[in-house]
A protein has these predicted regions:
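Substrate-binding clefts and catalytic carboxylate motifs of secreted carbohydrate-active enzymes
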Residues: 42-213, 218
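Intrinsically disordered, low-complexity Pro/Gly/Ser/Thr-rich segments with frequent PxxP/GP/PP motifs
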Residues: 213-215, 221-255, 345
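Edge strands and adjacent loops of beta-rich recognition modules
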Residues: 284-322
Length: 345
């Protein structure tokens, strides 16, 4: 509104005036649609320049809702096979590329025979989207990386309307995999892996330094066999980052799909953080492609042995609120990949 700044300054000259949330003292936001997650690490997600740099007021990535929510959005006949016209209508005219690029990335986990299978595989794509954005922010926090990143606002957390693109939770407030992988990426002490450099770093969000901590990395093949490992003692600065502590050297004969487990231990040997990744051997061939270890070559995940998990739970009440606390245990030596806990009532 013309004259708004002058009027506000006249009424209260002690307050600063911010005309909008982007392009006014901060750099522009976006993208919000699907890109190759490798571009987050490469810093090529936008044609308009660096994204995680300075203060970014708007940056995001999509995640498909759960199949239960998708069924609330449209008729079954349009859900599967995907009716592009209907999906695009429920995606702001195809704004987030859910029926195109997101679908292509999901198909890199193998073709789906049902909307249930597609929605499940699509959660892995959304998890990779969100986690890569946050861990790039971690790496570049306050100039510890190759950029100076002072802040990042994730746009947006949930769907304001019923649609085929969610974020951390959907229109029905159903959490997606993006929420849990965001929580992991933003834990106060966090060990993380860089898919572009193959390096391990540790991020600290505490106003306290930690000395003589140990970070470990283990690589497991598709048969859940440990094929590589390394550990190193580090000193972690207050509210800072220890970047590129060491490089993971993946064996040349490793299976096409494999897993990475990072752990961080304090001086008493207590585990204080852990992170899990899945990775393919596919080479990243540039920003105009959907290739790379985050993005393609995951079809072999279907060859993982099925695992029977053990579950136990307890219910309790605090005031007028009721809670269920569940514990999931994998009794086998096989990786139980991307397990979803669901309450059926």
């Amino acid at each position: 509104m013309p004259g708004a700044k002058d009027l506000i300054m006249k009424l209260d000259g002690t307050c600063g005036y911010q005309m909008q949330s982007e392009c006014d003292g901060v750099h522009d936001g976006s993208p919000y649609k699907q890109v190759n997650p490798m571009q987050h690490y490469e810093n090529t997600a936008s044609e308009r320049g660096s994204r995680v740099d300075g203060f970014n007021p708007e940056y995001g990535s999509p995640t498909i809702p759960t199949v239960e929510t998708l069924r609330e959005v449209m008729d079954e006949k349009d859900l599967w096979p995907i009716n592009k016209e209907v999906w695009d209508y429920h995606d702001g005219g195809g704004f987030h590329l859910m029926s195109t690029m997101y679908t292509d990335l999901t198909n890199h986990y193998g073709p789906s025979s049902s909307i249930e299978e597609f929605a499940t595989k699509g959660q892995a794509v959304g998890a990779m989207n969100s986690k890569s954005i946050w861990e790039v922010w971690n790496y570049n926090k306050f100039g510890y990386g190759d950029r100076y990143a002072s802040g990042l606002l994730f746009w947006y957390h949930n769907c304001p309307v019923s649609q085929v693109c969610a974020r951390m939770w959907d229109y029905s407030l159903e959490p997606t995999a993006s929420l849990y992988h965001t929580q992991n990426a933003l834990e106060p002490l966090h060990a993380q892996f860089d898919y572009l450099k193959n390096t391990v770093s540790v991020y600290n969000d505490y106003y306290q330094a930690f000395k003589d901590y140990k970070v470990t990395a283990e690589v497991y093949d598709l048969n859940s066999k440990k094929v590589w490992g390394k550990s190193q003692k580090i000193d972690i600065p207050e509210d800072g980052v220890v970047n590129d502590i060491f490089t993971i050297d993946f064996p040349q004969n490793i299976t096409q799909v494999h897993f990475i487990k990072l752990r961080l231990f304090d001086t008493k040997g207590k585990e204080v953080a852990n992170t899990f990744y899945w990775r393919s051997n596919d080479k990243y061939e540039g920003r105009k492609t959907l290739t790379g270890p985050t993005s393609s070559g995951f079809e072999d995940l279907s060859k993982l042995k099925q695992v029977q998990l053990k579950t136990r739970y307890q219910t309790y009440q605090e005031g007028d609120r009721h809670f269920i606390k569940a514990e999931i245990k994998n009794p086998s030596s096989t990786v139980a990949f991307f397990t979803q806990l669901q309450l059926l009532g």
